[in-house]
Curated annotation (Swiss-Prot):
Required for the in vivo function of penicillin-binding protein 2a (PBP2a), which is involved in the biosynthesis of cross-linked peptidoglycan (PG) of the cell wall. This is Penicillin-binding protein 2a activator MacP. Keywords: Cell membrane, Cell shape, Cell wall biogenesis/degradation, Membrane, Peptidoglycan synthesis, Phosphoprotein, Signal-anchor, Transmembrane, Transmembrane helix. Residues 1-82 are cytoplasmic.
């Protein structure tokens, strides 16, 4: 396994503000910029800057029906019982057919 790129020691040194020296990891010609994150607004957009208001808009939505697991299980059980009755009737008729063929 190769040498780790970032170790706990390197993180601690960076947090203290020390320079971390070492061989360049990538040969790229792009400049690395360090952005300060001490600003209280860093990462958050200010709604006033974009013309948004803080008011909550009420949107009219049709009430939707949420089916619970209990309802779904009940429907599945009803379907399974009907299916079992049909299968029982088909098997019973097949047995009667086989018996009728033997008697003839």
């Amino acid at each position: 396994m190769g040498k780790s790129l970032l170790t706990d020691e390197m993180i601690e040194r960076a947090n203290r503000g020390e320079k971390i020296s070492g061989p360049p990891l990538l040969d790229d010609n792009e400049e690395t910029k360090i952005l300060p994150t001490s600003s209280s607004r860093f990462g958050y957009a200010n709604p006033k800057d974009h013309g948004f208001s803080q008011e909550t808009l009420k949107i009219q939505v049709e009430p939707s029906i949420h089916k619970s697991r209990r309802i779904e299980n009940t429907k599945r059980n009803v379907f399974n019982s009907k299916l079992n009755k049909i299968l029982f009737a088909v098997i019973f008729l097949l047995i009667l057919l086989v018996l009728a063929m033997k008697l003839l």
